[in-house]
């Protein structure tokens, strides 16, 4: 994916994946293997865009502005890119579901570190190992099959994003 080759996006992704944590320039530099001077430049750009803010701690840290609609939008894009790049949807499609729908906080871009990814699959139950996908996306994955869906979840599923097939 083109965006993942952009160092600004790589810095922003740290805040998308761990949106409640305070991050530090040197920590980000180590995680994404980018010079701390470049990280600092990108941090200042993200502050200017209103996606993150400086914390008032002894050491200068930065945290996501999770209420900002632009942060939510960019986070949602990042979530979809991670799902696509993980190949999870391609693996699920091998079981011939009628549709695959992402719903819940991950779909809305409102997920935090402890959130899971809710995916509805219009199919009979099948087994799939999720560990590698969960490791790549940094979230637990919860698959909900058609036969297991109760009435209260139908509304959430109907508001979700179609990743494959149709409603």
Predicted regions span which residues?
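Catalytic core of pol beta-like nucleotidyltransferases
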Residues: 1-98, 107-113, 122-167
């Amino acid at each position: 994916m083109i965006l993942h080759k952009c160092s600004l996006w790589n810095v922003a992704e740290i805040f998308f994946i761990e949106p409640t944590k305070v991050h530090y320039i040197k920590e980000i530099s180590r995680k994404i293997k980018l010079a701390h001077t470049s990280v600092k430049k990108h941090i200042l750009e993200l502050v200017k865009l209103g996606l993150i803010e400086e914390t008032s701690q002894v050491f200068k840290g930065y945290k996501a502005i999770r209420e900002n609609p632009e942060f939510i939008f960019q986070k949602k894009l990042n979530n979809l890119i991670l799902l696509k790049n993980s190949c999870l949807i391609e693996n699920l499609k091998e079981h011939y579901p009628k549709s695959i729908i992402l719903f819940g906080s991950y779909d809305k871009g409102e997920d935090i570190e402890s959130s899971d990814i809710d995916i509805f699959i219009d199919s009979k139950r099948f087994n799939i190992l999720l560990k590698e996908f969960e490791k790549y996306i940094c979230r637990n994955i919860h698959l909900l099959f058609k036969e297991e869906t109760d009435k209260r979840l139908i509304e959430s599923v109907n508001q979700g994003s179609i990743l494959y097939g149709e409603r």
